[in-house]
Every structure is written in C-alpha cells, then in structure tokens.
C-alpha cells in the first residue's frame, strides 16, 4: 500500500514481470467490493474469509463475561496484527529480495495442468475470482501468484480490522456502557468525544478511499513486488499522497484513535498505539526498502546526492555541525561548551534549586521556581531578539558578513560561526525550559497550579507524541535542505551557479511550505500539555509567537528577495489538496476571456485569477514557448495575458519608448541598451511616487503590491509627466521578461504596470577565421562593451583599465562574460578577463581572436560547419 504511479488494474493496462514477460492486466476489484458486494462473484477463499469474519460475532455471543470478551478480542487482534506485520511482512520481504513466492509456486507446480490437487484448487480459486473465461496458462506465474497472495491479504487485513472493531464494541459497553454513561462523565464531554471521534473516523475513511482511488488495486495489494506496470517508473504524489508522507501508515490510522476516544477506553488507545507502532516497523523494514529498490535513485544519482550532502559541509569545516546535541564531538570545543551549558541549565540548576525552599533577594525571600521561570523568559526573549535582529541586519545590510571581512576572515567562516552562535542560543532556551519543568517534577507537582488535573495518561501520550513529532520534523527538514538551509545559509553565503536555483520541494517540503511554523515548536506544546501550568502556557505562547514572526516576517521576506515570489509562494501539497476539495471547480476553472482568433492558445496558457495564481505558468515561460509556435498575438492579447489590463482605466500611464517589435508582436530590447520610459500622472499625485524595473517572473503573485526590492533600479516621479532613461546599473543584465511599475507615495502600492518586454542578447556571429577579427571586435565593442562600460575606448584599448573605472569590477566582468556568451553562442567565463596572462594587455581585438580560436576548436571537435549563431538561434 504505497504511493505508486499506476493508471489502473483494468483491461488494457500493460504489465511486465521481472523476468521480462509482458501481458495485459485483467480487471480486478478492491477488497471491500470483492467481499461484500453481492453483485460480485465470490471465490472459495472469499467465502471462507466471510465465515471467519462472521465467527467473531459467534465469539461475542458465546462469551457472556465482558472482561473475558475483552481479553479474547485483544488476543485475537494481536494474532492478526502480528500475522499482518510479520506474516505478510515476511512473505513480501522474501518476494522482494528473492522472488521466493513465485519460486515456491513454480516448484510446487501450482499453476501447471498436471491434475494435482494443488493445481486444481488453485485454478478453481483463480477462476472463481476472475471468471470461468480466465485462462490461467495465458498469464505469467507472477500474476497468478499475486492473485492467490491477495486472498491471504484479504483474510489477514479484514480479520485484523474486524477483531479491532469487536474490541472497540466490548470496551465501549464495559462498565455499564461507559462511552455514553452520563453518570460517569458530563454530557458535553460525551458529546465532544463522540463528535471528535466520528470526525477522525470519517477523515480516516476519506484517506483510505482517496488513497485507493489514487493507487488502485495494483499498489493496494503490493503488486509491484510481483510485476511492474509499464510506464510506471516513478512514485506519484497526488490526492492524499500530496498531503502527508505515507498516508496509509500515518494519518491512515487516526481512525483507531477516533475509536479510542468514542469508546472512552485506555485499552483501545493502548491497542491502537501498539498496532500503529507495528505498522511503522512494517513500513521501515519492508515497504521503504522495496520502494527505494524499485523507485529510488540509480547508483550514480545516489552518489551525486551523497556528494551534495558532503559539499553541504564545506561551510562547517567539513564536519557535521552541532544541532542541539546531535552530531556531538568530544574534540570540538564548541560542542563541549554546549554540553556543559545544557547539563547546567537542564539538571544542575534545577536540582540545586529543589534543595532550598526560598532564595534571599535583598530582604525578600523568593521561590526558586519563580526565579527559574524568570530566567527562562529572559533567556528566550534574549534569544528571540538577538537572532531576529541579526538576521534582519544580515538580510538588509550584510552586517554579520561585513564584520568578518573587515577582520580578514573569509565569507565561508561566517556561516560556521553563525551556526555555533545560533545553536548555542537555541539549546540554551530549550535547556532552561526543560530545567524549569524538571524542577517542578523534583519538588512534586501541585495540582492547584495546573489547569487540567484529569486525563493524565492521555496528556502524557499526546505530549510525548508532540515532542517526537518536533524531533522527526526537524530531522526531516535537515534531510531535505541540509545544514546549509537549517542554519539560514542563504542569509550568509552568496548564491552561486552551483547552488540550487529553486527552493526544494522534496521530503517534508513536498507537503508543507513551512513545516517548522507549527511543528517546529510542537514539543513545547507537548510539555505544556503534560504539565499545563501558567508558567508553561506563557512560555509556549512566547515560543509560538517568536517562531511565527521569524518565519513569516524575516525568513520569508529574505527568501522572496533571493528566489522571487513565485518560488516562495508555491502551494504546498496540503494546500493543493484542500483547494482541490474545498474550492468549487467552477472557480478553479475560471480563466480570462480572449479573442476568438487565439482562443485555443489562450485557453491553454491564460492565467487564472490572482487567488489561483500559484498553479499557473509564468508569463516569462509562456513567451518563451510562444517563440516556438506559429501563432501571432496582438499587443492586446499580451497585455491581457500579463494581467496588465487591471490598470486599463488608470489615471496613471507608463509608455516604453524605442522598443523593437518581433514578428510575434513581442516588444524587445537588447541587453545593456538604454530604455526610456515616459510617465503620466494626475496633477495631485504624490511627490514621493516612483517607478521601478522588475523581472515579471518574480512579481507574478502580486499585481497590486510589489513585495520585492527594486535593487536600486528605480527613479523618482518629479512631475505630472516626463521621461527617464534607465541605463547602466539601473538595468537588468540578463535575458528575461521585464516590466516597469508605477508606485504611490514612496510605498510599494502599484498604480500602473507597463506592457511586458523582453531583454534579449544581440546576435553576434563569430567568423571561422582570423580575417574577420576586426569586424568581430568592432561588433563586440558596439553591442557589448560600449553598453556595459561608460566611455570605453577603442578595440585596442586595455579592457582592464576601463573596467577599473566602473563601480564593481567583478560584476562588470561577469556581465561581459554573460552577454558575450549569449550573443556569440560561445560560452566564456569571467576568468577570461580575471586570469588573463597579462590583464593590462587584454583588448577587445585580442578577445575576438580568442573567440575565433574557440569557435575553430569547437568546429574541429564536432566536425560541424554551421555558424554558431545559427545553432544559438535554434537553441
């Protein structure tokens, strides 16, 4: 029962065995329909299964003593649960690793027409399942073995569930129908239990139904242990599988806890925990290894993933950094310091405090518990303010990095030192909180100081569950984004081409965008639930508030600056699933209306409303796709696709001058070309109005408010109408789709958005011989160097001398390398300029000779005789 990509197990689906035999998979039915639908024929095994299930009712009727009933059904449930997790687990394990079930069937000649009792029984059973027209000999032995294995699964799984339900019933009616006895519990509590339990059961039912609709019988019965379905190479994450990892084993068991709540029985709760625990063992040792073997990465991919994890450690002196006390190393000074600190605040101080009744503060005696509480609050407030302020200063002003560089410490060292500081402060807060509660345990909990005194075992169970959830979530986060992400590496290390250009959507981030927002502090909630005192409640509120502020107002803002709105605000799996099931389909399908001439194209590419913008392609990608089509769009269509018609009747206007128009009616300009924008505003407009230049792919999510910085690509609106030329540092120096935005009153509220336009590279053809070097040099100078460097000299002027006069040497070299690579189709690195044999003597003319030589070498290697510029166009 796994998240397997499968079309269906109906006629027409193609199957292939592990030995290479292909076949058409016939129709099969799910467990419930097979057993309980009177319209579906019953096999001999299925009739036996129904009799065994009915026998549970006979056990209930024959045993009059309810205590004996409970003990009997506990024994039966344990038997069937062990049969499931260890019996079926063993069969699947030997089948996965050795194809043992198929070998047994082949050795016993189960499906041979030899007249033996075994073969006749097997044939009758399969034909009673599949119909008399089913020919056992025409199908692979693997598929027939799977059909018989399904009956074993049906027997064990249905018996497991039936005995559990019988146990729920006998526990619920115990002690004079305790689950609804108003003499034992108040009516409002009974009603709350029944409603909550029913909700959990219905949710569990939805999970099971949705899971089966997604994975079908093939994966429900572990079909890929026996054969594969063709075009079924990847796991699928859809429906409930997009909400939580392994839903059949995680939230697929919440119904068990719902039954425990309804029955008001700790016996049922204990049995549910026992069954769920065994199921997780089954997942870890049987299910996951097979998933990794069948759907996991290849050997090379696994090696690459391991190398990436090792490279993640280069910022931490190539040793896993300390997270809490995880990765502790005796020979690392910071680890020893953390160990002493954690031990002191968690155990030593609370123990010493428990030895005294009061602590003298001046003339007043103060309870040690009060001092520990104040200490915990002070430490948490200090950690919250210091970490948050440092992250803000680092995000906007690079304060942390600048200090290290000013002291001749490399950038790579900043993240390692930050990780030590961050982990020490976090460990200090948790140690002080633990110490506060440890002190109260040592002196004995006073019931009058607790909000809740009842349901002790339930509180302990839920509290421990929340603590383990936080530990699991934190480990999943580190596994997904590495230590670099855990310690806010994006704040400290500049993003390079080697780093990921997109935020990860693997692991726990497939289901939640910010899993740490709630689950990152649920351990504190768990401790508060176990010891529900006012002190713990205040601490819990403080933890949750700080976590919310740090993630939503500091981390998210920085991620938007680095990766853009579109990347940060993608819907998580849970959000997608809730939208799919809660938002009416008519709203989801509503698209902008387009012209009749382009209706097919617009229906395919048009953006949805702003609410659903997260599920659409960017205008940037759309225009790139448009280049490969023969469809012509009008400027009106382009404006409509970009959602700029929102401002059609605005009193504010922006018009971009001197743009080129392609045959697809797209407005373009060459990288580095000055761009003049004219504005028109009402007479009473604010003198603080301003115009900024943005990349559309980073502003897709908000057409009325700009959420990212203009990075100094802006100008003040000084009059009711006028124009301004964006050039040099005011421009973007990379290809893409861009737009100008008119903002109001010095803020980021948008009054008008210009038509989108594309920045492209000029087409410069590199000649095949040095005879054309002068022409190439002049073209490079005119289309690249004159635009990138103000006042550039001749083609024989040293490039380095001109670059030295620019604002940023490295940035200028990177721009030159990028534009030349895009324009010529020959990739060069900034190292061409930085590591030249004699930087002072490198000229545009000599650079053109280098390009011609590179082109010649590439042509010789590829035996190609077409111009590189033509190849570039095709790309």
Swiss-Prot record:
One of its GO terms (molecular function) is phosphatidylethanolamine N-methyltransferase activity. It catalyses: a 1,2-diacyl-sn-glycero-3-phosphoethanolamine + S-adenosyl-L-methionine = a 1,2-diacyl-sn-glycero-3-phospho-N-methylethanolamine + S-adenosyl-L-homocysteine + H(+). The lineage of its organism: Eukaryota, Fungi, Dikarya, Ascomycota, Saccharomycotina. Its EC number is 2.1.1.17. It comes from the Eukaryota. The keyword Lipid metabolism applies. Residues 64-71, 174-186, 264-265, 360-370, 446-459, 539-875 are cytoplasmic. Residues 1-42, 93-152, 208-242, 287-338, 392-424, 481-517 are lumenal. Keywords: Endoplasmic reticulum, Lipid biosynthesis, Lipid metabolism, Membrane, Methyltransferase, Phospholipid biosynthesis, Phospholipid metabolism, S-adenosyl-L-methionine, Transferase, Transmembrane, Transmembrane helix. This is Phosphatidylethanolamine N-methyltransferase. It is found in: Endoplasmic reticulum membrane. Catalyzes the first step of the methylation pathway of phosphatidylcholine biosynthesis, the SAM-dependent methylation of phosphatidylethanolamine (PE) to phosphatidylmonomethylethanolamine (PMME). InterPro entries: Phopholipid_MeTrfase, Phosphatid-EA_MeTrfase_fun, SKICH. Its main location: endoplasmic reticulum. The gene is CHO2. GO terms for biological process: methylation; phosphatidylcholine biosynthetic process. One of its GO terms (cellular component) is endoplasmic reticulum membrane. Pathway: Phospholipid metabolism; phosphatidylcholine biosynthesis. The chain crosses the membrane at residues 43-63, 72-92, 153-173, 187-207, 243-263, 266-286, 339-359, 371-391, 425-445, 460-480, 518-538. It is a multi-pass membrane protein. Belongs to the class VI-like SAM-binding methyltransferase superfamily. CHO2 family.
